[in-house]
């Protein structure tokens, strides 16, 4: 497995909508520099740092620097509508990416499983033409068995699962269920560690992120469900610290600790 960082590793450093912004928000090039600094082999730039907002010159500069540092770029977006996805696939190709991550839903809403299937079927020739693999991330809106049936129904090697072990808590599914149902179809792994603790009132539980290797996610166990030929991309759910820059600093520290841990187990 290749160790990767993501724009979702550094959400607070980039800026989270609805919260105070950091003094110096990270750009895509800043993110690439951080990946190089920490020794990551892969950088996944997703929808919280939209690649389609970059100029052609910025995309070319990013691609050239990534190549110079031997870092593979992975492109991330939301949605599966062909009229939106096809131009984004061209952005991915321009960056030299061979992998694209997406979600079934976007700002326009969430499709039904059948609508998603028809959209993905229409994308297959576009992916094949460009030599791209698409990873559909499991998320809150669908049970993993629905995702499994959807991906298997496409009968193609160019679309698989981008597996997040924590997102389906909202569907009442454990990490083990997610890995069992989707592991064999996975083409990209979001390594997101977490902890669950009871509220001070004893009435309910809170789920929070932790640095990778310091929470409840058993990474070596996860690997047993996954193919080796994919990237393991760190994502963080760093809690808000009451101040934008303080939160960004904690997040940066967590990212470094996460990389250090993964280097011992990958």
Positions of the model-derived regions?
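N-terminal pre-domain/capping segments
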Residues: 1-97, 249, 256-266
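Hydrophobic faces of well-ordered beta-strands that scaffold small-molecule active sites
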Residues: 3-10, 43-45, 71-77, 100-102, ...
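Conserved, mostly hydrophobic/aromatic
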Residues: 5, 35, 66, 92, ...
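Active-site-proximal loop/turn and secondary-structure-junction residues that shape catalytic pockets
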Residues: 9-11, 47-49, 79-81, 104-108, ...
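Charged helix-capping and loop-helix junction motifs
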Residues: 24-26, 56-61, 86, 90, ...
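Active-site acidic/histidine proton-transfer and metal-coordination neighborhood
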Residues: 58-59, 65-161, 170
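Acidic/histidine-rich catalytic cores of soluble enzymes
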Residues: 122-216
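A short, acidic, amphipathic alpha-helical segment used as a generic capping/interface helix at domain edges
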Residues: 213-227
């Amino acid at each position: 497995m290749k160790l990767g960082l993501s724009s979702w590793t550094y959400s607070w450093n980039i800026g989270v909508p609805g919260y105070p912004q950091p003094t110096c928000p990270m750009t895509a090039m800043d993110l690439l520099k951080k990946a190089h600094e920490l020794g990551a082999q892969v950088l996944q730039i997703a929808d919280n740092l939209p690649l389609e907002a970059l100029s052609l010159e910025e995309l070319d500069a990013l691609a050239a620097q990534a190549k110079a540092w031997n870092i593979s770029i992975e492109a991330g977006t939301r949605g599966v509508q062909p009229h939106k996805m096809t131009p984004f696939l061209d952005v991915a190709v321009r960056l030299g990416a061979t992998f694209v991550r997406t979600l079934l839903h976007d700002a326009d809403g969430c499709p039904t499983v059948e609508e998603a299937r028809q959209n993905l079927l229409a994308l297959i020739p576009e992916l094949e033409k460009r030599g791209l693999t698409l990873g559909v991330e499991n998320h809150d809106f669908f049970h993993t068995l629905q995702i499994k049936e959807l991906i298997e129904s496409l009968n193609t090697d160019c679309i698989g699962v981008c597996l997040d072990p924590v997102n389906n808590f909202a569907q009442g599914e454990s990490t083990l269920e997610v890995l069992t149902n989707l592991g064999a179809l996975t083409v990209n792994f979001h390594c997101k560690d977490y902890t669950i603790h009871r509220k001070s009132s004893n009435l309910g539980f809170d789920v929070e992120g932790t640095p990778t290797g310091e929470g409840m996610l058993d990474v070596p166990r996860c690997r047993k469900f996954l193919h080796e030929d994919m990237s393991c991309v760190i994502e963080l759910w760093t809690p808000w610290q009451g101040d934008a820059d303080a939160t960004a600093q904690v997040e940066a520290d967590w990212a470094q600790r996460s990389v250090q841990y993964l280097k011992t187990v990958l």
